[in-house]
Each structure stands twice: as structure tokens, then as C-alpha cells.
Amino acid sequence: MSSTEAPTIIKTIEKSKSDKFECVIKILQNGLKALLISDPETEISSASLGVNIGSFSDSPDELGLAHFCEHLLFMGTEKYPSEDEYEEYLAKNGGNNNAFTKGDKTVYYFDIKNSAFEGALDRFAQFFICPKFNEGSVNREINAINSEFSKNKNIDIWRLDQLSKSELNPESPFSQFSTGNKETLSHNDIRERLLKMYNKLYTSEIMTLCIYSNMGLDTQINLVEKLFKDVPKRENFQMPKYDKVKPYDENSLNNFYKIIPVKNEEKIIFRWFFPFCENYNAKPLNFFTALFGHEGPNTITAYLKRENLITYLGTSTEDHANVFSTFDIYITLTKKGFDNYREVIKALLKYISVIKSKKINERYFNEEKNMRQIKFDFRNKKKPIDFTKKNCENLMLYKPEEVFTGKELFKEYNEKLLKNYLDMFDLNNLNICLLSKSFENECKLTEKFYGTKYSKEKLDLKKEEIDKFKYDEEKYIFDYPPENKFAPKNLEIYPNHNPEKIIKYPELIFNKENCKAYFLQDSEFNLPKGMIKLRIYFVKNLNHNSEIKNEIISHLLKKIIKLELNEILYMAEESNVEFKFKIYYDKMDISITGFNDSLKSGLKEFLTNIKNIELNIEKHKEVFLLQKEEYIKKLRNFFLQSSYKVSIDYMRKLLSTGANNHKDLLEFLLNEKLELNDLINFKNKMFLETNSVWLIQGNLLKETALEIINTTSEILELNIDTPITKSFYSKRAVNLKKNINYTYRFLNPNKDEQDSSIISVYQLGNLKNEEKQYYRILYSFLNPKFYDTLRTKETLGYIALMSQFDCLEIYHLVGIVQSSVKDPEYISGRIRNFYKEKEADIKNISEEDFNLHVKSLIIEAKRKDINLKEQFNRNWDEITLKRFKFNIKEENAEFLEKCTKEGFIKFYEEIIKKNMKRLDVEYVCQKHWEENEQKLKEEIIDCDSIKKRLVFDKISDFQDCNKLYPCFSNINYRKINQ
């Protein structure tokens, strides 16, 4: 479109039946496309802007430049020069923001309360009109990118992604390192290079904007024209061509790789390369993603799992800048599977060969097509920020009228196209990767950026071998999955029996000695869906002297039962009926969600199967031993995930009783005797003496809910009437002593990990309702400043954030930092310094700023639940905590409206400053250990409130030196065992 052409409006857009909003697409004179969505009911507005340029545009000597642009773009504009302006405006008005860079696109997005949306959108638009790329921020953001790279360096998914890129044609942009690091971005003229790239490639005609707001469409159109008309359209712009050289060649294909992963896992990854398919309405590769990833009867997953060769099989497909596509199959192997990995490879390729020999199954295609249509028509409402982010990308990929449907629906059955793509599943365009720690002596090659060790050879596999592969044809069938009996047939919305009296909150509809059930018929979301959750507390099973053993037993039992039911569970899930169960040492959670047409019959079938499963030595010994091995691997791998995630888990275990840590569980599995008979005995006793509670909610009638409760009680033989005399244990929160800095520190076993993490916890205690609101205001005030200080200004690590942690009604403020540049004790001091510096800001907060934070929290408290799931989960929390404050959001809003600046300052003085209760959880990498240990011997002199330091390396020692809080919730299913 030339700059003299009139703007265009597109009004005919395919929507879901459940979409209540209005929308249009506006194309501005400068070529920018804007999808505008008007939803009068939303309390939160959002905008996302995508630029059809990403890391593929980086030149080989400035890798990471597009990602660097994404970071630095937010650092001030000509109109709003302060680098903090955008972040501070969002923070004061309850907003959030982020961005991401892909190979061929970069997406920026935010959300905020409605009343502040125009101001935020103005600030946002300026990034694409007149950014400053603040010179003082350059080195800081290079450090931030390097921290991000360091954070990802020991995560297998990042390492594998880069290895697969590096094996492509080195002349192709698809082979490049995209994140960037200090080495690739450390040019003296990096800012000038960035400006050159921005001024050349950030042009309006390759930008897409998506807005979701309560504003009417005419208002949105005028606003977008006003704010985005000056986004420059670059003269002589030419879209980069990524297919000048072929991305893969003979050297890139038909290879077999052995790779040493970070985690102790054995995996096989199959990757096929395909030409890009422009016909997105036929979606051939998406069709085969569904088929080859299916876990129901007749499938390859069913065969491999029943033979105890794998624990997981997943499929995915990805289009790469409309140049080529890849199709991946990921398999996690058992020990047996790894020992026989060639048989696993041949079995999978044999399954594909059998499917190739058959006619494309139109029945299965139509089943997938119809199910996708039903899911789309009755989709749950998403948060505005998630919706704009997704559809901003979709606007780049699909016709404007198909922006919502292009990615989701199968519209066209094209047998010839499907057959053509099926025939391309061949050895010649396939790479196979085998991952194992056992390849230490075989992998002599090293990937440049992440240091991944691997070996490479041509795939030693012939079609004849696959053809000769034999499987027990009396026991197994290789074919398309059978027809799905769980597919919903009745999508009727049940009317409320008393429309004049709409019930807003769950009501107690079943009240027996040992069973309580709450029910709420939906009158808000109007979708043919329901959610059911049942928690069963065990009494007979609880043995205080063997909690660790019982936790292990319950985990293994859950895994074996799930494996037994895997095919039927997957068939249900394919029809959007999701059955989940978790077995703990003291309780069992059962849930079923999805289209209500199948909930009652589905739950009955699942529970009957669980009850009737007979574990026996002959049938289950092999799977028991394999699951035990898998659990040992899982526990060991826990310590190899992102450092801050390990620290967070330990924080939770330190601050409450009754949680077994991974180290103790691992030691028990390695050193103590555990047999299948232990699981059999546990299962036989599980339902002998129980206490249960239900929540049933959604498009269901009360009579149906009562039928479900009674049927379930009969199937599981729950004793709903007999009084329980035996008391059992309840979790309690740990009460930290005042003016002590507790430190729990432990060493990361991975010698290659360069990052340490610290979780710095300030315990506030049990708070009154009014105090809880001041706690939320304090978090709202400090959260963006914490990020700005420790992440942006001090560049201590890519992960630097605050969080709120409610542990059994005891409230905490939590600071989280993961860093490769400084040890945890140094960062602990910087966090103490942060609180010290912000004390003056808290005491001197202006009335205007205070009111902005309060108003944003009131809007959030009054915000309607976005979907049934959000509402259900909140109600479930109230039931399990036995608070029953189903109107908690309204209550919070009432208390917030009474909050004053003076009350806020008083809260800080009395609850925080005079009541300093602090715990640091430090997960220390090996390069930081000695320095960190030395600092732990020094006194804390930078905090007046801290008088003493106590250091621990055992959870039991830490908990033994502190008292416990009383049980604050009203729940008394379990009395404290004295």
C-alpha cells in the first residue's frame, strides 16, 4: 500500500461462538495492521505489537542484535525520556509488560487497568516512533543478555535447539546463535549498529498491532490513528530473504547424533525436514502431529508404553519463517528402552510405515476437525494480555479474516496433500538424536556456544530393517486410533431453575459425617463445561514414622495406575475431558474437567478402573522396578534444573512441616527396602477410613451433582457416615524468631553450572484482613523497584523479581535473584540495602502515588473471573482451607477502600521494621562456594534490625530451632498429633 492510499477497515472476521467481543482490522496509511477488539466487560486492557523481524536478520558478526534491540527499546523515548517512565507508569496502574524475540519476529506487549490504557498506549507507541536507545543503558543490557544466556546455558532444551541450528547450512541465517552474549555484542559501536538495524528494519508495513479494551471500536480506531500514524515507513525497505541459500543440505540430513545432556535422562528425538506448506487450512503436519502423538489404542505410544520401553512420547511441528518446516517426535526412554533403543527406533518407523501403507483415514481426520471446531466454538476466555500476544502473531501469519481460526481449525480435507506429506516421512530427511550421560567417552565434538558434547555419524538404518521389525500382532494393532466415545454430543446450556435468584457462590448440598460437597451451577460463563474436584483424606494409611516411605509408595502407585489407564485417559483428553488424580501419603485428589456431557460417565468409568486394578507380582514387577528407577532419576534431576526453582522449592519445605525434601526421598530409595507388596498394602487400605470434600461447578444440575457424589461413594466404598475417632497430622507453618538472619545454604552438584540463586524471605506472620491489603500495597509498591534496582541498574542477574508467598495463612515477601556474576551472600547484602533505601520512599510516598496503587488493587479485586477455571480454583482454595470466604474478592475490595497512607506507613513500621524475621535460601554453584562460605562467617553490619546470623544445612535442624504457628484455618479434618 502506498502512503497516499486511504486506510482500510476489515469487518468480516471469523469468530468463536463464545466470543462476545466486537472486532475489526484497521490498516493505517503507513501499512501498520491493527486488530482492534472491544469487550465492554473487561476491566483490564492490553496491547501487543509485533515486528516481522527477528534474530534471522542478525549479521554473523553481531549475533543477538535483534534480541538486544528488544531489551534496549524500552529505555526511554524522545517524548518520554526517562528510561523508567514506561515501567513506572505500568507499575502504578497495575500493569505488566514483556517482550520476546523469535527468528523472524519480535513481539512487545503489556496490560493495564482501563482508565490508564490510553496513557500506556501512548508511551508504548513512542518506542516505534522515536526511541532513545539510552547510551547509559547499553552495557547494562548487554550484561542482562549475558545473564539470560548464562541462565539458559545448562538447560537441555536450549542446548539442543542451538545444536540443531549449528548443524544446518552455516551460510543460512537459520544456523545462527540468536540470544547473543557479552562476546557477540561487545563492539565499541554496538549502539550505532543497533540504530542502523532499527532504522532500516523497524518499519510500519511489517508491524501488527492487537488491542483488547473496553473502549468502543470507533474510539479505538481514532486512538490508533492518532498514536501510531507517525510510526515510520522506511523508504526502499526490502523484507530480508531467508532462503537465499538452502537451510539444510546432505550434510545436515540422515544423521545419527549421540548427545550428553545436563539432566540424567535417556531420550530419543526424531526430526524430519519438510518443505513449507502454504495451505494452512489443510494443515498436513498438524494432522500427523495429532496422529503420531496419539496415545490411545492401536498407536505407537500404546505399544511402547505397554512394553515398558518409554515413559513419554510427544510430537510437535514448527514452520521456520515460511521457508521450511520441521516435525519432531520426542521420546523419554526407560532403562529397558535405552538398552534396546534400536528396537524403539524401528518400532516407531514401522508404525509410520504401516500408516503409509493405508489410505488416509477420513473418519479420523473429520473427528479431529470436528473436535477442533467444538473446542474453538466453546473456548475459555483468556487474559487480555495472552489474547493480544497470540493474535498479534496470528495477524502476521494468516489472512485478516482468519486471524482467530487460521491456527486453530482443520477446514479442508485434502487427501492428496496429506498423502504427499506422509510419504515424505523418510530416512533421507530424518535426523535422530540419542541423549544419555553414558556417552562421556564417545562424544568428541563440542557445540560452540553452549558447550554441548556430541558425536555425529550417518544414520545406519535401512528400510529393510524396518520392514523386518516384528511385533506381537495378536496383542497389538498398528493403525489409526478407534472412534472416540468421549466426544461430546450434547452441548446444551442448562437454564437456571430460579432465574430471579442467581446464586453466586457454592452451596453445601451434601453434608454427611465424613463427606461434604459444595455445588454451584454456572450462570456466568455459559459454556457447556464443568469442573469436579474431590479430595479424599486417608486415615488408615498415615504412619508418622514412615512419611517418607508412604510418599514414595503413593508416587509409584500413582504412576503405575496412570500407566494402566493411559489409553482411556488420553482418549478422554482428546475430547477435552481431562481426568487427573494425585495420590499423596495422606490424601488423594481426583478431578475431572471439560465438556459436561461426558463428566458423569467418564468419572464413573475412571474410578471403577482405579478401584478394580489388581496389582500383582507377576504382571507388575517389571513396571514397578522401572518406575522406581525413573523416580530416582527424577529426584536427581531436580537439582539440575534452574537454580532459582530449586531454591523456591526448598523455601516451601523450610517454612512448613510435613514436606519431605528430595534428598531424603532419594536416600530412602537408594538405601531402604521397598517392594511391590508395599504398594499393594497401601492401595488395599487407601479407602478404609476417609474424610472427603467435593466441589462441583459449571453447566451441571444439582441432581446430577448428587448422583455423581453417591455413585463415587459406592464405587470407592467411602465411609461417608461412620464417625472417625483416629486423629491425624496437620501441616504447620514455621514461626521465625525476630532479628535473626537465618541462612539455609546448599551446594549445586553440577560442576558446569555457573549460576547461584538466593531466595530472600521476610516473614510478616498471620495478618488481619486490613493488614493483608497493606501487604498487597507494599508488594505493588516494591515489586517494580526491586526489578529495576537489582536487575536493571545493578545487573545482578536476568532473574530478579519479587513475589508474595502465603504459607498456611502466614504471609511472606520474597525476593528472588539468580546470578552468575555474584555469590548469594553478596546479593543478600544488596537485598538488605534495597529495603533500607526504599524505607524513605515508603515513608514519603505521595498521596497520589499511594492512591494509584490502591485503585489498581481495587480494580484487580473487583475484576470478574476470566473463566470457569479461575473461579473454580479460587472457590476450591476457600473450601480446602475451610475459610469459605467465597466473596473474598469483594471483601478485599472493601478493605482496600478503607486503606490510608498513614495506615500503610504504620503497617510498615510495626509489621516489617520492628518485626524483622528473615530467611535466606541459597543454592550455591561450585565457583561461588568458597567465597560465599567465607562471607557467612562475617557479621551482618548493614541492617540495624538484624542482631544475629544462624546458618543451616539441614531442614530438620532449622525447624527444630523455631516454634510453629498454630493452625489458623478453620479446617479440622486432622487434629494435631501431640
Residue spans of the language-model regions?
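M16 family metallopeptidases and their MPP-like homologs
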Residues: 37, 42-68, 82-127, 158-184, ...
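Active-site glycine-rich loop that binds ribose-phosphate moieties when present
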Residues: 188-194, 674-678
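His/Glu-rich zincin catalytic helix
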Residues: 2-85, 122-125, 182-185, 195-307, ...
